[in-house]
Every structure is written in C-alpha cells, then in structure tokens.
Amino acid sequence: MTKQLLLSFLALSIGISQTVIGQEIDSTALKQLEFIKKVTYGMGHDLFKTRALPYKIKEDYVAPWEKLSNSNMENLAMGLDTIISNGSIAVEKGHFEEINVVFSSKVEGIENLDDIFTIALVAYTLFDVNKNPIRLKENARTNFGSISNSGIKNGQAFSYNYRTIKSAFEIESNKDTLGISGTVKLQASFPSGYDKVVITPKDIGKQFTIGLKKYEVLNVFNNIIILKPDSKNENLDRDFDIVNLNAKGDEIAQIAYFDLLKMNEGKEKPIEMIGVGTQTISEKIYKIFTENPTISKEEFDVIIDPIAKKIFSAEDIRAEREKQFGQTYIAITNAGPVENCYLYLEKRELKRAFEKEF
C-alpha cells in the first residue's frame, strides 16, 4: 500500500512543499530534503547574522497619513462626486498600440491626488458591432496631469487649475472596437484614514491589532522585527505596509543598487545588499537561530535530521510537522536599524460606485 509523504515539514518557514510517493524516501526525495535544509539554513543565517547595514536617509519623506491630513473628508467626498460627474468613457489606442477603454475626468482642490486616488473595475458588459463580448483587463493604468489657465473673460477675472485623470483598462479580447456598446461599472475612492502602529526596540512583548489581525512583538534586533500572529488570525497574509522612520520623521530607506556598488569600490569586504520586506519563519527555526545565531550548517543538520525522521515516520505527517516546528512567525526586515517602524493599513471607506455607458 502506497503512502503519501508530504516533504513539506519546512513549509512553515520557507513555503516549499513536495509530494513523495512510497514507503521509503528515495534518493530524489533526499536531494529535495537537502535542498530544503540548505535554503532554510540560509534564510535563518541571513536573518540573524550581524552585518553592516547600507541605507539612506530620505529627509523629504511625507507619511501617507500626513498627506491625507492635508485634505478633509468633506472636500474629498465632494471631489469624488466631481470626478464622477466630469467623467467620460471612450476607446483609445495606447502608447504600445494596445486598445483601451479609458475613463477620463478632472477635479480641482485635491492635494496629493496622485497618491490617494484609486479607481477599480467593478463590472462591465461590452459588445462589439457584431454583438461579440469584449473582455477587459481588470487592473487600471492611471495617469495624472494638469490643466491651468487664467485671464479675463467678459470683464471678469478667471483662474482654474484642474488635475486630470486618465484610467485605462486594456481590451484583451476582440480588438475590433468599431461600434462598441454596453456599460462599465467603476468604483472611485480616496482613503478615509489609516490604521497604524509604531514598533520601537523597546516594544518587545507589545500586543496590537491592525486591520482585523492581532500580533505580538516577539523580538526586535538590529534591522529585524519578529511578530507572533494570533492563532485566530484568518491567514498569514501581510495586509499592512511598512516604513521605518528616525526621530525626525525621515525615512530610513533602502539604498539603490548602483549606489551600493559605488560605496563598495576599493573595499576588501563589500557591504551586502539587504532585501527589505517580510518573510515567514517557523517557531523551531527561530528558536535555533536565536539560541545560536552563528550556528554552522553541520550543527543545523544535526538538529533537523532527527526531526525529519519523526515527521516521515508519523501517521499524520501534517500534524507531526506542526508539532515539531510549531507556530509560524513573521519576520520584518528593514533597510536600517529599527527606530520607529510603522505598520500601516489604508482604510478606503470613502468610495463611490458609478456606471458609464457607451
């Protein structure tokens, strides 16, 4: 009788899984196991090792919630109504000869429009001249511009400064757009606020909620933050964005690759580029590297191999894997030392759905 072995006991830490058929682990499976151990060790070693941190300070940084504070909610709500009433829809050819359904509009008095306005395709029913259905790509390419003028008309001074919006949805089927007919339903929105939390090196043990998910700050060291998700969280998806600020509110940002190359010129030991973002790490792997950040690959294998044997010999592979490797944590890697790391989540409660007809 064959038995499926899920070669994924490390999936909690690196997201790799492999199915192996048979009672015994064959040579191919062993090679895959060695590869998984190598990748997992490399990930843990890279996360916990002491290193120089190449980063830059962006003094002109303005946080998203500060940009939003420049426009009050009443003004934004009126702006949405204006965008919809001024809006029109047409078929246009793009820069790369693609054919697009384009929503165009204009509005005055909205600061940071480029940063805060979004538009989404809700639904559509479109046909060509022969009544064949037309399909659209769902993601819009939105460009912003401006139109301004001033002068005197009929003895009265006038002045206007419009921001323009052009959102293009590419037609991906039936490029014959002559006689296109139908309706497009869109949703335009502005953020209504931000759910945010700040994490500093002093916040180990801090519990917080962002969006609908709860976390605990398990550790903060160098440029790393380790979060322990609440077991009741729906999933491990990272819903929040991240920015690390110094005491002045400047961004501690990732250095550009070519700037790093210039920085490393003439150095015997070049500074490594650091990947900024989040990754998952299992409780067991975290514990191994916390207790011994400089553990060698050989020492790592001595710990992992007996665990692998227990998992492969268990009746319930998945349950044993979870038992051996424990909960999954989230590791946040910043470009520079953690000072004031903001996790923030945009709220888009200010939105309007509307239809345009061909």
Predicted regions and their residues:
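Bacterial Sec-dependent N-terminal signal peptides
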Residues: M1-S27
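Alpha-helical, hydrophobic structural elements that either
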Residues: Q23-F358
